């Protein structure tokens, strides 16, 4: 066993470039956190999960912390480090397809009414000692609908629940599936907001082919990138591309003011430094202006205009974006 352990240490040494003595010191130091008066945390970045052995990495982290008693204690646990603070905001502020603000579930097609939606997603507990905080799920859902539609949301119209878009049951709307559907021609338009899927996607070549099947694309970013200019990529004939691309220059993080959330679930307010250059605008102002113009168009009517026409859009302060 000792020879095998030493051999494994040699392999780690050759792979990581870390001397064996230093590795031993790290292992021994962290193992000492498995004591009543100590705690240790494991902090990792996206590489651990996105690695080819990502599942094993995560399971191993959890097992190590459980064995050392480092779960459920102050200073313990397994904690992710974000490269960009508002990556955490993507979950806190419902930028992912499967959740809405407050971590409420995205309505499914089978949730035909607000009552059916609440019945589906409100957890039930027979344990008399269970706090079951989510038993008030219906209150959260009504509160969210009122924030969406304001005075237009009332008990008589199910608080506007029928105006919400619904996802098909059992269908995946995550990143890989989204671009696969785009590749199949299921999308007319695409907002590439603060991203560059022509380079960052798992199959960048397929993503670029998918862009060519769009009628239009809006690229919101600091600078033009490979996604916005996919039509002049290697081996592409621009004359054969039907996609109309619009570029909206956005302000950098230091050029705008606002709040962020991080992995520790605390919020931080960040003040503006330099003013945005040229005609670039903060993301929020771009969204605000788009919303104003789209609402103005839907006030004239159109197919299923009610959700947009009745949308509460009162984010201006003294007539200006704040």
What is the meaning of each model-derived region?
Residues 258-259, 264-322:
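Long, C-terminal catalytic modules of enzymes
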Residues 15, 44-52, 83-85, 195-199:
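Conserved short loop/turn motifs at secondary-structure junctions
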Residues 8, 35-44, 153-159, 187, ...:
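Short acidic (Asp/Glu) and glycine-rich catalytic loops that position anionic groups and cofactors
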Residues 66-244, 249-257:
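Extended redox/cofactor-interaction regions of prokaryotic respiratory oxidoreductases
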Residues 16, 20, 27-35, 62-75, ...:
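Structural signal for hydrophobic packing residues in well-ordered secondary-structure cores
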Residues 1-7, 11:
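Single conserved hydrophobic/aromatic residue that forms the stacking wall/gate
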Residues 29-30, 45-47, 77-88, 303-322:
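A glycine-rich phosphate-binding loop feature that marks nucleotide/adenosyl-phosphate handling sites
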Residues 25-41, 176-188:
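Glycine-rich phosphate/diphosphate-binding loops that line cofactor/substrate pockets in enzymes
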């Amino acid at each position: 066993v000792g020879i095998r352990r030493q051999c494994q240490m040699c392999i780690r040494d050759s792979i990581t470039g870390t001397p064996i003595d230093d590795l031993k010191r790290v292992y021994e130091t962290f193992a000492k956190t498995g004591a009543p008066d100590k705690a240790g945390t494991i902090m990792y970045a996206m590489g651990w999960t996105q690695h080819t052995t990502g599942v094993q990495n995560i399971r191993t982290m959890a097992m190590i912390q459980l064995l050392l008693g480092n779960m459920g204690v102050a200073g313990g646990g397994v904690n992710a480090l974000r490269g960009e603070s508002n990556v955490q905001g993507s979950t806190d502020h419902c930028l992912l397809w499967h959740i809405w603000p407050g971590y409420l579930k995205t309505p499914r097609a089978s949730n035909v009414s607000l009552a059916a939606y609440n019945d589906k997603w409100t957890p039930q507990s027979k344990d008399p000692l269970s706090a079951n905080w989510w038993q008030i799920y219906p209150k959260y859902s009504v509160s969210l609908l009122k924030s969406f539609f304001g005075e237009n949301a009332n008990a008589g119209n199910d608080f506007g629940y029928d105006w919400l878009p619904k996802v098909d049951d059992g269908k995946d709307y995550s990143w890989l599936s989204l671009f696969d559907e785009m590749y199949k021609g299921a999308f007319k338009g695409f907002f590439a907001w603060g991203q560059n899927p022509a380079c960052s996607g798992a199959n960048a070549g397929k993503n670029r082919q998918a862009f060519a099947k769009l009628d239009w694309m809006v690229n919101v970013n600091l600078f033009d990138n490979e996604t916005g200019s996919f039509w002049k990529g290697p081996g592409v004939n621009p004359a054969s591309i039907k996609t109309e691309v619009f570029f909206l220059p956005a302000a950098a993080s230091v050029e705008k003011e606002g709040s962020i959330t991080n992995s520790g679930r605390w919020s931080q307010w960040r003040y503006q430094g330099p003013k945005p250059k040229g005609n670039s605008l903060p993301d929020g102002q771009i969204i605000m202006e788009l919303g104003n113009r789209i609402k103005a168009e839907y006030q004239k009517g159109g197919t299923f205009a009610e959700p947009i026409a009745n949308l509460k859009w009162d984010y201006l302060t003294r007539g200006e974006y704040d």
